[in-house]
Amino acid sequence: MSFEGFPGLPPHVNARISTFMSGDLPPAHRNMGIRPDLWCKEASVGRVLFRWPNDGSRDINDGRVFGGWIAALSDNIVSLCMVTALEP
């Protein structure tokens, strides 16, 4: 999958996240099924919007998502948000 970049981000930020957003994910993301390449819908400096399609595959009970997985997803979102604000 190719990544064209987010129009609200400076070129150096789009360059930093291009591999990640093209689906070339690190092992931890692949193992946990965290897909920023599919779920990150918008990004601008200091802001990202993720839409996670909760299909129940991360549930520990009916309608209850495993908290550790939510923590990992949240960490990923916050990290990506931080990257949008880094200087060149």
Language-model features and meaning:
Residues M1-P88:
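Terminal targeting signals and extreme-terminal segments of soluble enzymes
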